[in-house]
């Protein structure tokens, strides 16, 4: 693993250097020029297995191959060029100010399931037969694109029209949903879900081919069309913080893994998960796990999820953001042997339109955007500085306002009355949406950890 020069400075050495510069500058009455340090690597993948038992390293394509509407070159530190702030050195230097200036932060956001039931597909289909899914994210894209690193759980496979567009129970989405995800600001697409094999191996191949062709800079996780890629874990560098991101599903709805592609879906296999976490602990500063787990429509995490969260904690995971239950679940903070881990057990559906009716359907259109700030302090220690949850509601009104997700705080009584889900669940009201959030999450408020010493 390539080390960056500036990381080798200890706090005591840095303070000594600052003191030395102070004396020199006071004597010469000169201003210190900014220091620029180069070195390191781009976004990287590291192999679980190599001939000499060391991580393998590969570099992502250069910027000339990138054609996303939102290039990661602006967000993920592709040059690894670290420029220190200009500091006028005097005899009255405040070390705390220098430490704060040299610290780094990364804002990570993630949304839950993009579950494209047929009424959504039909609403987003244009008169000429093409698809436009931009309305789904029209009221949240500003939030999503503000993150340094934005993740989404793409619940259904994106196999394209050649495999037949379909909804429940075997989903398949057209390619334009990928366009809408990128245009809305997402950088990382989690594909390890129970619907990953709804269209067999062909669905996975089509999905990955489209991502590689249309958006080669977008990071996809959880599905593979070749064995070599399946041996890797993904590590991205954002603002000089190396972040490993792992994605697994509990299963594939009983659809067997193809014998010709036994590696095609990342599942919650204990040995594999532990090996990935241990490798991430060696090569990354911070590890995010995105498990597709739990029991559908249950508003609190299960013992199955808790058992897995203990494994994640024991092997160094720092942040867990769960999906699959199709409803929101509790958020827990764990501490063991000096290690902290934040766990969002389920952030619910982001986009969905179930055909079910009756009490509880309301719960399936309320979700949340996980919002976490990661900090790397002056001494190189990386930890969660603060976290938040931004409640959302999926508005379903094909004729007038279409299908779109709103932050709950911007949702109105008028919109709630127009939401078609109220025809399927008479308890759907704005007040009841807020009550659900209050019951499960205690409302939407920013939560801060005490700063790590």
Predicted regions and their residues:
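Generic alpha-helix initiation/capping and coil-helix boundary signal
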Residues: 12-15, 277
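Acidic, metal/ion-coordinating pockets
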Residues: 27-34, 38-39, 57-58, 62, ...
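Basic polycationic patches enriched in arginine
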Residues: 7-8, 48, 66
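Bacterial N-terminal signal peptides that target proteins for export
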Residues: 2-13
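C-terminal motif of bacterial Sec signal peptides marking the signal peptidase cleavage site
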Residues: 23-24
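Short extracytoplasmic/periplasmic juxtamembrane "stem" segments immediately C-terminal to an N-terminal membrane anchor
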Residues: 40-48
């Amino acid at each position: 693993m390539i080390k960056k020069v500036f990381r080798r400075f200890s706090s005591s050495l840095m303070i000594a250097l600052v003191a030395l510069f102070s004396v020199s500058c006071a004597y010469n009455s000169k201003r210190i020029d900014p220091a620029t340090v180069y070195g390191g690597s781009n976004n990287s993948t590291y192999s679980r297995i190599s001939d000499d038992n060391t991580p393998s390293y590969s570099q992502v394509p250069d910027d000339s191959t990138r054609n996303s509407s939102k290039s990661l070159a602006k967000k993920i530190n592709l040059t690894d060029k670290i420029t220190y702030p200009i500091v006028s050195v005097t005899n009255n230097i405040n070390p705390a100010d220098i430490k704060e200036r040299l610290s780094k932060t990364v804002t990570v956001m993630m949304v839950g399931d993009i579950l494209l039931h047929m009424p959504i597909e039909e609403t987003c289909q244009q008169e000429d037969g093409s698809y436009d899914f931009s309305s789904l994210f029209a009221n949240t894209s500003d939030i999503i694109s503000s993150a340094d690193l934005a993740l989404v759980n793409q619940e259904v496979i994106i196999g394209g029209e050649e495999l037949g567009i379909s909804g429940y129970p075997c989903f398949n989405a057209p390619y334009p949903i990928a366009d809408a995800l990128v245009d809305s600001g997402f950088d990382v697409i989690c594909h390890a879900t129970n619907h990953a094999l709804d269209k067999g191996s062909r669905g996975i191949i089509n999905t990955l081919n489209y991502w590689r062709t249309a958006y080669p800079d977008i990071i996809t996780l959880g599905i593979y069309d070749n064995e070599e890629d399946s041996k890797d874990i993904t590590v991205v560098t954002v603002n000089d913080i190396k972040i490993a991101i792992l994605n697994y599903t509990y299963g594939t709805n009983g659809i067997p893994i193809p014998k010709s592609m036994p590696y095609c879906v990342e599942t919650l296999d204990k040995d594999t998960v532990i090996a990935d976490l241990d490798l991430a602990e060696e090569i990354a500063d911070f590890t995010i796990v995105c498990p597709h787990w739990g029991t559908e429509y249950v508003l609190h995490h299960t013992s199955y999820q808790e058992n897995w969260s203990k494994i994640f904690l024991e092997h160094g995971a720092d942040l867990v953001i769960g999906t699959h239950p199709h409803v929101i679940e509790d958020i827990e903070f764990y501490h063991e042997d000096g290690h902290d881990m934040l766990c969002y057990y389920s952030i619910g559906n982001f986009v969905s339109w179930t055909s079910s009716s009756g009490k509880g359907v309301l719960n399936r259109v309320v979700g949340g955007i996980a919002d976490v700030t990661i900090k790397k302090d002056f001494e190189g220690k990386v930890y969660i500085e603060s976290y938040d949850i931004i409640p959302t509601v999926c508005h379903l009104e094909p004729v007038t306002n279409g299908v779109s997700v709103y932050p709950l705080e911007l949702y109105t009584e008028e919109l709630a009355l127009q939401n078609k889900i109220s025809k399927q669940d008479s308890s759907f009201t704005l007040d009841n949406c807020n009550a659900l959030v209050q019951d499960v999450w205690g409302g939407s408020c920013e939560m801060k950890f005490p700063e790590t010493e």
